[in-house]
Design a protein with these regions (language model features):
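Hydrophobic/aromatic beta-strand patches that form the interior of the parallel beta-sheet core
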Residues: 29, 286, 324-326, 477, ...
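Switch/communication elements of ASCE P-loop NTPase nucleotide-binding domains
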Residues: 1-59, 370-376, 397-535, 550-552, ...
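Short, solvent-exposed loop/turn segments at secondary-structure junctions
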Residues: 11-13, 24, 35, 84, ...
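Short polybasic amphipathic segments
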Residues: 6, 75-79, 153-167, 178, ...
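Short glycine-/polar-rich loops that comprise or flank the Walker A/P-loop
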Residues: 73-75, 320-322, 445, 474, ...
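Acidic, Mg2+-coordinating catalytic modules of nucleic-acid enzymes
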Residues: 23, 90, 131-134, 156-161, ...
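Conserved P-loop NTP-binding catalytic core
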Residues: 42-149, 153-160, 221-239, 245-251
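Extended helical coiled-coil dimerization/tether regions that scaffold
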Residues: 212-214, 219-223, 227-238, 244-264, ...
């Protein structure tokens, strides 16, 4: 399975969010704490669990998941997917085939058709029909079924409604599930009414479609039509086309799209119930039994509903890892049923010791997979550490007080020196490395959702994890607070999604056109310093022109009224040195693209058309137009200034776009603040400026905060105060 688009409405903080164009390989979800990143994974998990509940016939309340702003009180989760593995496609085809081909049900259905009440479908006739129908229910003929939207709607008064919607000949068709009425697995054409009630067996509709359709007479073979034939003769001849055709004269192909549209028009439903013992040996029933554990020949074994099928598909396709990895405290008891299961799909990290033993002692392909996981673990952990399994028998006391022998499975980790220690005695980092190695190797055709995978990994292991993630075969969705995990290539940054909490919910941003326009520069910035990637995790960013401001401002900010004793770290605000006024445009566009609240403090000459150089000469500001163009993008209400505009006007206009400078009649730099200038001149060796971060920090600690600095810092921190202190802007739908 692949996920292509996720939409949520009224789910926790994700009130109205859409993430489109999700990469088929690797995606990252970032942002500050409380922005809703984990809520996205929770929405996907709720969707999966809703199908599991529906498949088992239970109802699950979701009232506690409403957004606080939800009106009306309705939760919607919509995920566009494609079923791209051979197993998934064969399962969908097998379910459709099995639902339409039950011999006893066909016998009952055909008797309800006009002129066929006496028609008997013998086992031989059933075999002929099944053989033909099997050729219609193949992946090649059902390609249109493999891309669609899985949807959950929840309302307190009606409960959960689930559906899968796909396109048939340009029309939207939905499979309705988890609601009664109608029957689970009912086809319906969009739009679906609030309370659909009528439904019919799809087998009835199939036979009607084949034998009683309006244009059936046009399809009748000439050899079955005679002037003396009665209508009953013609209808029986049509039935014989499908149930008693001579060898080599199979009926023509069924237009599956047209047939499913007919099912949607007549509200046919799909379900696999009890069948004869002979039918259970057909490959379709074998596959469905392996997936579901249902023995279809046993009367009390249960039925395979549509919601149950989708629950199984989602269970096999989606792997949710925990944000906290805890190794076993002791070797696990041997369990042959868990070591050698019929269905070897791994979903739970608690099954890893059993699953690893099963593939270690499995066939050739499984042994190769075991060695790949060992190699991946060695790469991720480094230091030439590897693991292997040990099965041994130990003697321990039972609850009755008697001694008993117990077989156990232990995971042993060996380092470069040859020292071997049980995984039960290792830290969480090594266990997490093994869990990730296992799930990522087994990721082909699956969606692996990693919640904070860097939580227990030191930076070097995080960097190596990036290599492992890039080489994984499946689709990976990563929620992280670690800048070490983010890609440095600009093209891969296209699939970094940043969550920003606003007054009425979460908005989601991606770099989009900015990344394409600044491809080379973005990559250079991300590759040269992790500080740039770290900006994505903040509540806001204060941009400054150079190291002088970067050294002094963190000392003064807690002393301002808006700082109120809090440091930048307390507010999760990053102060970033852009490295010169010419770099302001790039960083402002970057922050805007990812929805990061920003403010900037620059020297007065950054917004002026001219400046005075160190020699006292007037020079033209080559970055004047570039900066003002960006400020106008950030605040369309401001007007592009003329070079003749007085500085007081420029200063006021720039502040509307979040760019601030010192409140003086003429432009000054940081060193032009009177108190700063006096301190520098009063040093044993007078200076015109503080040249380093250290000197600026020493300066800030040595003098009282100047009024000019206090005013500009109050302006910027007032703009950046994190939610809920900062007024939320009108939220628009992202990405």
């Amino acid at each position: 399975m692949k996920v292509h688009k996720i939409t949520t409405k009224n789910f926790l903080s994700l009130r109205d969010c859409t993430i489109d164009g999700i990469d088929e390989h690797l995606n990252f979800f970032v942002g500050p704490n409380g922005s809703g990143k984990t809520s996205l994974f929770r929405a996907l998990k709720v969707l999966k669990e809703a199908f599991e509940a529906a498949g088992s016939g239970t109802r699950k309340s979701l009232d506690y998941l409403y957004s606080v702003h939800a009106s009306p009180r309705q939760i919607d989760i919509d995920v566009k997917v494609s079923w791209d593995t051979d197993q998934e496609r064969r399962a969908l085809c097998a379910f459709l085939y099995a639902s339409l081909s039950t011999t006893s049900s066909l016998n009952e259905s055909i008797k309800r058709l006009p002129h066929l009440s006496a028609y008997q479908i013998t086992p031989e006739k059933s075999a002929l029909f099944d053989d033909w129908l099997r050729e219609q229910c193949t992946p090649e003929k059902l390609q249109f079924l493999f891309t669609g939207q899985i949807h959950l709607t929840y309302r307190e008064d009606v409960g959960t409604r689930l559906s899968y919607t796909f396109a048939c000949k340009g029309e939207q068709v939905s499979l309705l599930m988890a609601a009664y009425p109608p029957q689970d697995g009912t086809f319906w054409k969009e739009p679906v009414p609030a309370s659909p009630t009528p439904w019919r067996s799809s087998r009835d509709i199939l036979l009607e479609y084949l034998l009683s359709s309006k244009d059936a007479s046009e399809k009748d073979p000439e050899q079955f039509i005679d002037e003396t034939d009665t209508e009953e003769d013609v209808v029986k001849a049509r039935a014989d086309q499908y149930f008693a055709y001579p060898a080599g004269e199979k009926p023509g192909s069924l237009d599956m799209e047209s047939f499913l549209l007919d099912l949607a028009e007549k509200h046919g439903y799909l379900e696999v119930g009890q069948v004869s013992e002979a039918q259970t040996y057909l490959p379709e029933y074998i596959l469905l039994k392996e997936m579901s554990g249902i023995n279809f020949s046993q009367p009390n074994s249960g039925r395979l509903s549509c919601s149950k099928l989708f629950a199984l598909l989602l269970r096999n396709a989606c792997v949710f890892t925990k944000s906290v990895f805890t190794p076993f405290e002791e070797p696990v008891p041997f369990d042959e049923g868990r070591v050698f299961p019929v269905n070897k799909v791994l979903n739970d990290e608690n099954d890893i010791p059993y699953w690893l033993l099963g593939i270690r002692d499995g066939d050739v392909a499984e042994k190769q997979q075991y060695r790949r996981i060992q190699d991946s673990f060695r790469l991720l952990v480094g230091e030439e550490r590897t693991f292997d399994l040990s099965v041994r028998t130990i003697t321990q006391y039972a609850q009755t007080g008697t001694l008993q022998e117990v077989r156990t499975i232990d995971i042993l980790v060996t380092d470069a020196s040859g020292n071997t220690i049980s995984m039960a005695s290792q830290g969480t980092g090594l266990w997490e490395a093994l869990v990730l190695s296992v799930f990522l190797d087994d990721s082909k055709g699956r969606v692996i959702l990693l919640d904070e995978p860097a939580a227990s990994l030191h930076p070097n292991m995080q960097h190596r994890l990036v290599e492992v993630l890039s080489g994984a075969a499946g689709q990976i969705l990563v929620v992280t607070h670690s800048a070490h995990l983010l890609p440095t290539r600009a093209d891969r940054l296209q699939h970094v999604y940043r969550f920003q909490r606003e007054a009425d919910g979460t908005r989601i941003y991606s770099g989009g056109p900015f990344l394409l326009a600044e491809l080379q520069k973005v990559e250079n910035k991300f590759a040269s310093s992790i500080d740039v990637a770290s900006l994505l995790f903040t509540n806001g960013v204060l941009l400054v022109e150079g190291a002088t401001e970067a050294g002094a401002f963190p000392i003064w900010i807690p002393l301002t009224a808006k700082g109120n004793g809090q440091s930048l770290a307390d507010m999760n605000i990053a102060l970033h040195d852009v490295g010169g006024k010419e770099n302001f445009p790039f960083y402002l566009r970057f922050l805007k693209a990812f929805g990061i609240p920003y403010a900037a403090i620059g020297d007065g000459d950054a917004i002026s058309p001219y400046y005075i150089d160190r020699n006292g000469n007037t020079q033209r500001n080559r970055n004047f137009s570039a900066l003002w163009k960006v400020l106008q993008e950030l605040c369309p209400k401001i007007v592009m200034p003329q070079e003749t505009e007085p500085f007081v006007v420029l200063k006021k206009q720039a502040a509307r776009a979040g760019f601030y400078t010192y409140d003086t009649p003429d432009p000054i730099a940081f060193e032009g603040i009177p108190e700063v200038e006096a301190f520098l001149q009063g040093l044993p060796q007078p200076k015109k400026k503080a040249d380093t971060f250290y000197e600026a920090r020493y300066l800030a600690e040595s003098i009282t905060m100047p009024p000019l600095a206090k005013k500009v810092l109050n302006q910027t921190i007032g703009r950046l105060r994190p939610f809920p202190h900062r007024k939320g802007s009108a939220r628009k739908k992202g990405v």
